[in-house]
Amino acid sequence: MKIAIIVREETMLRCTGGGCLNAFFQRIDSFARYADREDVELVAFTHNGGDLEKKIATLKKKAVDVIHLSSCTRGKDPNYEALAQRLAEDFTVVGYTHGGEIGSTGPAIILEKAGKSPVTGSE
């Protein structure tokens, strides 16, 4: 299973990505769903700025299965829902990386790739 993490561009001006990467490598928080899998590979770590459609095309070429939106995107980006919906046209989307599935701004968006049934964070 191939994973990509998309973070908030403005946050990346001061963030090293440590929280997202720690959660991935420790298989905690949003990545706990993969704890029993050995085939999980992080193939991209990028921000939401720039040419999103070009990034989507590249992620599709890399055969990404799931995109995790960073927790800072959920908490601070007014386009969080629209971004998740657009990405769900081509990928399964998990709308947070570290911390709880239910954050201070509400529950994280969890979407299956378009055409599939919605999933919950516990699946």
Predicted regions, residues:
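Active-site charged/polar residues at nucleotide-handling catalytic sites that mediate phosphoryl
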Residues: K62
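Structural motif
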Residues: D65-V66
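Short, aromatic/basic amphipathic alpha-helical patches
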Residues: N79-E89
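Conserved mixed alpha/beta catalytic, RNA-binding, or beta-rich assembly cores of soluble enzyme
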Residues: M1-L59, S70-Y80, V93-V94, G99-E123
